[in-house]
Amino acid sequence: MPKTETYPRLLADIGGTNARFGLEVASRQIECIEVLRCEDFESLSDAVRFYLSKHQESLKLCPIYGSFAVATPIMGDFVQMTNNHWTFSIETTRQCLGLERLLVVNDFVAQAFAISTMQENDLAQVGGIKCEINAPKAVLGPGTGLGVSTLIQNSDGSLKVLPGEGGHVSFAPFDDLEILVWQYARSKFNHVSAERFLSGSGLVLIYEALSKRKSMEKVAKLSKAELTPQIISERALNGDYPLCRLTLDTFCSMLGTLAADVALTLGARGGVYLCGGIIPRFIDYFKTSPFRARFETKGRMGAFLASIPVHVVLKKTPGLDGVGIALENYLLHDKI
């Protein structure tokens, strides 16, 4: 078995929109971090080769171990990205890049591994009390899509991550307003999943649905060119666009519903961790948003949920951290 101290290791966190690359030069020490847009490259291998050529001067040795996190289920050697055009064979990619080992995991497996090493300043707590040691931790987060996984820390300190595709569960509206939003989405899609709303494109979809309401006929609206997740959230926070504010409030409420569903399903007394790039953009608003109230609005299970802390992950590159830890575990135990 290869020695675990062999560095550098090639790390990648590949989402629907961006691919983040880094070189782990020593345990938990990642350098040369770079973000590339997936749409700029025909294939994953092209993006990797571009990254390595750009950082050739920093490489004293060529990486022989690689660990990639991808935003799609891993169901064998062939990988097809859910939210971009890349497809690849793990084994062919390993050979093409000259690697001895290439580990490929779901992106939220990497996010979950990263949670295990986070410090207090990497997180912002939103309600709840204290995490229960060794209880399951729920990890989820809206980005280009919606990822969900579970982290379990055993009594001996070893880690186990359970991947899942919880972002694709059927969305259940909570009230009349959300029924209206659901009906709008149902007119466009055969299956209305949680990810349809709890993602960047979901924020736009919620806005479009709410703009059809009679009460919104005379309020200021965004132009087609302005209809992006970033602009919707920015206008929501400046107070001049009631429709944008209602959109963001609805988004946070819906996220509260899903986070509570996941917490109840897993018995996540170890806490709920929200990853992804969307929430940190408006963290101050999020702390006072409808999210926490909705999270606890579960009838007889309200008290159970009230004690569970929710943490927003503030760290910039948790996916790279996590995929490095996943590789470390794999090399030590020959399994994730």
UniProtKB/Swiss-Prot annotation:
GO terms for molecular function: ATP binding; D-glucose binding; glucokinase activity. One of its GO terms (cellular component) is cytosol. It catalyses: D-glucose + ATP = D-glucose 6-phosphate + ADP + H(+). It is an enzyme of class 2 (transferase). GO terms for biological process: glycolytic process. Its main location: cytoplasm. Its EC number is 2.7.1.2. Coiled coil: none annotated. The keyword ATP-binding applies. PANTHER family: GLUCOKINASE. This is Glucokinase. The gene is glk.
